Regions:
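Hydrophobic alpha-helical transmembrane segments of multi-pass integral membrane proteins
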Residues: 1-204
Length: 204
């Protein structure tokens, strides 16, 4: 496995760029690492405000499960997908997701964060958004790996599919009021991300 060695894509000349042409959307890690960092700080602040009563949590789902979901399926998913969509470009030689496609994926991720905080009881809408985010990312990563016949990396698709299942099961559990079961799926997701980290560590 070759080390990650990216050539920075930059505009060929200075001009007024449309949003999908911004350097921010030329590589997957750029928007997702930025958003993951910002969200990790904001989510912790919101959690602190909920704990001390500054913010009133009105949803039926326990705030602890909102916090767990956002740290695991919000923050961690952004880091994982941002990294994989970028690193796979080196592993496969296939261009990673960029431009309008990357903007759409980022918009889905942001929408899911907003839905869960402002409309936490609408678990069905959040479920659709989260599944769409995972499937979009998995589909493009699969395209990169299959196009290059990078069979030894197919395991990553399997792990991401498991994380999609855990995320969906978590949201279905909260929708049905099975909060103990939802906590179980957060624990399984943590193990899933640990497995993904171990696999990536063996690649780089």
């Amino acid at each position: 496995m070759r080390p990650i060695n990216l050539t920075e894509p930059v505009p060929s000349e200075f001009q007024l760029l449309k949003p999908h042409q911004w350097p921010l959307f030329m590589l997957g890690f750029r928007p997702f690492f930025l958003l993951a960092g910002l969200w990790s700080v904001l989510a912790i602040l919101l959690w602190q405000f909920i704990l001390n009563g500054t913010l009133s949590w009105q949803a039926q789902i326990p705030a602890t499960l909102w916090h767990a979901h956002e740290m695991i399926f919000g923050f961690a998913s952004a880091v994982a997908i941002g990294f994989l969509l970028t690193a796979a470009q080196t592993w496969t030689g296939v261009p990673g997701l960029s431009g309008k496609g990357l903007m759409i994926l980022v918009a889905i991720w942001i929408s899911c964060r907003a839905i869960f905080f402002f409309y936490a009881d609408n678990q069905l809408l959040l479920l659709l958004g989260q599944v769409l985010f995972w499937l979009f990312a998995i589909a493009y990563l699969s395209h990169m790996l299959v196009t290059s016949a990078s069979k030894h990396n197919y395991i990553m698709i399997v792990v991401l599919a498991l994380l999609t299942i855990f995320n969906s099961a978590f949201l279905m559990s909260t929708w049905l009021g099975e909060y103990s079961l939802a906590r179980l799926f957060t624990q399984l997701a943590v193990l899933g991300f640990m497995l993904l980290i171990g696999i990536i560590g063996g690649r780089v």
